[in-house]
Amino acid sequence: GEIRDIETAEIAVQASLTGHLVLSALHTNTAIGAVTRLQDMGVEPFLLSSSLLGVMAQRLIRLLCMDCREAYAPSSLECELLNLTDTSDPVLYRAVGCSSCNETGYRGRTGIYELIEIDETLREMIHDGASEQAMLAQARKNYQGIDADGRRRIIAGETCIEEVLR
């Protein structure tokens, strides 16, 4: 289930500390934001640092309709946004609309994900009450954010920039 209050959070932490694998949901914008949310609920940092193995963020995006997506040469701003500087002639795709997709330009959905394993460094940072920004900077040394997964889907032609940014 979802962790919405301190009582549920404490039950989840206690279950984790006694050897149970606990999977739960929290509403946050980033994976590391789950740590901050649990702290804000009142979970003690020393308990949190001992009980977390990893945190994950996910978001649904629409997939471009493969029957009508339109290839185009991205602008310099789009190339910069996607870090496509090493590609000579990059191609991206945009939604158009056809009878197959009810004129929306999209057919289906998929998830984009971010997974952060709580390593010893992050565990110490959580225990010491480090800021979300500091923990995020540390996590980015080893793990890519949800935006990197979105970028991969854009470059593969599965979705468009607008969909990942919305």
Describe these PLM feature segments:
Residues 1-166:
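Short, flexible helix-loop junctions that flank or precede catalytic/ligand sites
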